[in-house]
Amino acid sequence: IAAVYETRLPRQPLRFVLADDPEAGKTVMAGLLIREMTLRADARRVLIVSPGSLTEQWQDELREKFGLDFELFSREKQEQCHSRNYFAEQDRLIARLDQLSRNEEYQQLLAQTEWDLIVVDEAHKMSANYFGNKVNETGRFKLGKFLGGLTRHYLLMTATPHNGKEEDLQLFMSLLDG
């Protein structure tokens, strides 16, 4: 709790990696941060990006522990929305990492929006690495750079921030540069 209230919230903009052991409470820390930023009017529009297997868990935990209601993005909701851009219609949204990284249409729709805070869970999946002198940027890494440009506050959460190679860690940390 002190990490959220004493260390992170006073810094503006908030752009950092939250790296801790599995089951160490990263989701709770993110929830506290989201709730507090919402109460302070620093974050009205919040997007959470996570692996598909975790989206409903995020939705449930944010509702049950923090009283925050988030919608889940889906192809069906996008197809049925009146504005033709579900991302623009929702102020609190959870989307699947691979659904966004593999779909250029969704990225084009996202490009038309701005977010106060974007949280990425399992952010180590947005990796890039050096192969000789060349940088190999994955689609997920490109998504991470793209998301960083859509928001003022950017939180990357991971239990495994790097693979032991300093160059790859520097590439991962560059996602925060926005």
Residue ranges and their predicted role:
Residues 14, 46, 161-165:
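Short, surface-exposed helix-loop/turn micro-motifs enriched in polar/charged residues
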Residues 18-20, 122-123:
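Short acidic donor-binding/metal-coordinating loop in glycosyltransferase active sites
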Residues 128-178:
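Post-DEXD/H (motif II) to motif III coupling segment of the RecA-like Helicase ATP-binding lobe
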Residues 21, 51, 160:
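P-loop (Walker A) phosphate-binding loop of NTP-binding proteins
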Residues 18, 24-34, 157, 165-172:
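Extended, hydrophobic alpha-helical segments in both membrane/secreted and soluble proteins
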Residues 1-8, 12, 26-31, 35-149:
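SF2 helicase/translocase NTPase motor core
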Residues 15-19, 47, 155-156:
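Short hydrophobic/aromatic beta-strand immediately N-terminal to the Walker A/P-loop
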